[in-house]
Amino acid sequence: MPVEYLVDASALYALAAHYDKWIKHREKLAILHLTIYEAGNALWKEARLGRVDWAAASRHLKKVLSSFKVLEDPPLDEVLRVAVERGLTFYDASYAYVAESSGLVLVTQDRELLAKTKGAIDVETLLVRLAAQ
């Protein structure tokens, strides 16, 4: 089954809490290498603030991340072009570029990225779509 959705770090964080609702559709979901580091940084921050046990959270994150196909990194010049044209960060532009150039639906919780990426959806919409399949 082909990949249909590109999940950014904000969506990954939200999806981690709903593992049972999407895991059977994992072959439709992909991330970027960047997503791994962004998710790790969010985990680091939560651990530093004492909100999570880093070891347990790390095990869960590893399980979640291993469920996704990791896509190739996009051409940096194209990502920079999208970032400048749309007023996005380089990180966000990488998701927008890959989703649009690959015909994937971007899944994000970032309002600006939702507004500036053609066809982007949030996690709630993704879960509804997957449940209907």
Swiss-Prot record:
Changing residue 80 to M: Facilitates structure determination. Gene3D superfamilies: 5'-nuclease. Residues 5-113 form the PINc domain. Mg(2+) binds at residues 8, 92, 110. The keyword Metal-binding applies. One of its GO terms (molecular function) is exonuclease activity. Its cofactor is Mg(2+). Inhibited by EDTA. Its EC number is 3.1.-.-. The keyword Transmembrane does not apply. Keywords: Exonuclease, Hydrolase, Magnesium, Metal-binding, Nuclease, Toxin-antitoxin system. Belongs to the PINc/VapC protein family. Toxic component of a type II toxin-antitoxin (TA) system. Has ribonuclease activity. Has a slow ssDNA exonuclease activity. PANTHER family: EXONUCLEASE VAPC9 (PTHR35901:SF1), RIBONUCLEASE VAPC3 (PTHR35901). Homodimer, 2 of which then form a homotetramer. This is Exonuclease VapC9. It comes from Pyrobaculum aerophilum (strain ATCC 51768 / DSM 7523 / JCM 9630 / CIP 104966 / NBRC 100827 / IM2).
